[in-house]
Amino acid sequence: MGMPMDVYTIRHGESEANVIIKAGETGDNSLFTQDNVTVPDRSWRLTATGRKQADCIGRWLVSQQPLFDRYLVSPYVRTRETAATMALPKAKWEETRVLRERSWGEINTITQDDFRSNYERNWIFKRTDPLYWRPPAGESIADVAENRVHNLLTSLNRRAEAESVVMVTHGDFMLSMMLTLEDLSDEEFLRRADAQQWRITNCTCLHYSRRDPHTGRTLSRFHWEQTARPILDKATGRWDVEVEDWREFQRPVLSNGDL
């Protein structure tokens, strides 16, 4: 048994729900209609922009690694549409519920005003404790990390030793994977949660590897990560992929003074 050599984890493209929520964040609640707020979270589809993002990251991914050993996808419509639009050659996708969206419970697709007025204390905790905060009847980031991410990694350790794996999932699941694979402290997670550079935008790809990208040596644990994300050139209307440098990380060990 052993871990995969490479894991490419991709967030779905822009969805219909993303558009509604973004509008609400700017004070426009006109899209929170009765028809929209009763749509099950699993049923939201990609927008035209989301399909362009998926096509863009798919073409980049093929240029990096044309074929994978294992293809995993969340069963939600927006992730399945993203995976299909990426058009990876010879892909054989396995749907797995472990990759599903974090549960937002009772506040899924409600306005910020409704959230604040109906769940005032919970609304405060969302801002002050984003790692352990749970939406009413929902999941925290820590819940997803300790349960579903660990289940996924255990399964991959049993079934996918030294393989290359591609997964299409959701933003908060990817945050939970980052938390787990990089053994982030609570403080480091909170720092990243507040930083623009760590945002997992639609169709962002986090590539984790056990192979040193500079020397080719391999380790038993994931030790390197590279981020890629689709970026729209507003002048030309074209989508291109912005690729960051590789990051090396290791499990932090703390002294008494550090604690």
Q: What residue spans do the PLM features occupy?
A:
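Phosphate-coordination/substrate-recognition cap region in phosphate-metabolizing enzymes
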Residues: P4-Y8, S15-A17, K22, A48, ...
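A solvent-exposed, charged loop/short amphipathic helix patch at secondary-structure junctions
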Residues: A23-P40
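GST superfamily/GST-like fold recognition
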Residues: G171-L175
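Beta-strand elements within well-structured catalytic alpha/beta cores of enzymes
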Residues: D6-I10, L72, E163-T169
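Internal catalytic-core helix/loop-beta-alpha segment
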Residues: W133-N157
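Glycine-rich phosphate-binding loop signature in dinucleotide/nucleotide-binding domains
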Residues: Q64-L67, L156-E163
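Short glycine/proline- and acidic residue-enriched helix-loop micro-motifs
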Residues: N36-R45, W123-I141, E248
